[in-house]
Amino acid sequence: GVWPVDSGRICIDGKDVTALPEYKRAAYLGRVFQDPMTGTAANMQIEENLALAARRSGKRGLRWEVTKEEREKYKKLLTSLNLGLEDRLTAKVGLLSGGQRQALTLVMATLVKPKLLLLDEHTAALDPKTAAKVLEITDKVIAENRLTAIMVTHNMADAIKHGNRLIMMNNGKIIFDVSGEEKKNLTVDDLLRKFSENAGESFSDDRAMLG
C-alpha cells in the first residue's frame, strides 16, 4: 500500500517524487513482494511475464509475440540463476515453486533498470534453503546491475550478511544505523542488545533469531 507523507520529502535520483501519483512513482521503482504469487501472472508463460516486464516503460503497441531476440536474452538471463528456468520459457508460471517465482520476479523487476529496488521481506514466505538461494541471486542481480536497493527484513542474520548499510526501525523511527566494517562485525546478539538499549523493550519476533 501507500503511506501518506506527513512531513519531509521523498527524492529518488535527485527528483522530488513526494507529490507524484503512485503510477508515476512506480516508474522509478522495481519491487519484489513477500508473497511469491504477487509479482507474476500465473496463467502466462515465463517468457510472456518477462516480455511484459521488459516493455513496461516503452511505447505500447499491438505487438504481443515474444521475438527471437527477446527469447535469447531471457534465456541468457535465466541461465545465470542456475534454476533450470532457461529451458522452461514456455511453461506457465503457476507451475513454478515459490522460490523460482521470487527469482523470476526479481529478474522482471530489474529488466528495466530501476532507480530503486524495493525488496519487501521477499524471502519471508520461503523455506530457509530456498530463501538463502534467492538472497544469493538477489546479491548477484544487484551487484551486476549496480542497483540501489532497500531490503526490508525481520531476519537479523540476513540484515547483517546482506547489503552495506543496516537501519533498524521501531514504531516508524530509526533507532540504529550502521555501515562498513562495524556492520560486518555485528552479531545477532549485538543487534538484539542494540534494539533493547534504543527501544527500551525486548525484541519479540522469533524470526530475528534465525541464522
Predicted regions: what is each one?
Residues A131-E144:
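Helical segment within the ABC ATPase nucleotide-binding domain
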Residues T153-H154:
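H-loop/switch region of ABC-family ATPase nucleotide-binding domains
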Residues K173-E197:
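Conserved beta-strand-loop-alpha-helix hinge in the C-terminal portion
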Residues L117-D120:
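Catalytic Walker B motif of ABC-type/P-loop ATPase nucleotide-binding domains
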Residues G8-K15, F176-V178:
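Conserved ABC transporter NBD signature motif
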Residues M44-R56:
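Q-loop/switch helix immediately C-terminal to the Walker
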Residues D16-G30, R60-T67, K184-D189:
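ABC ATPase NBD coupling module
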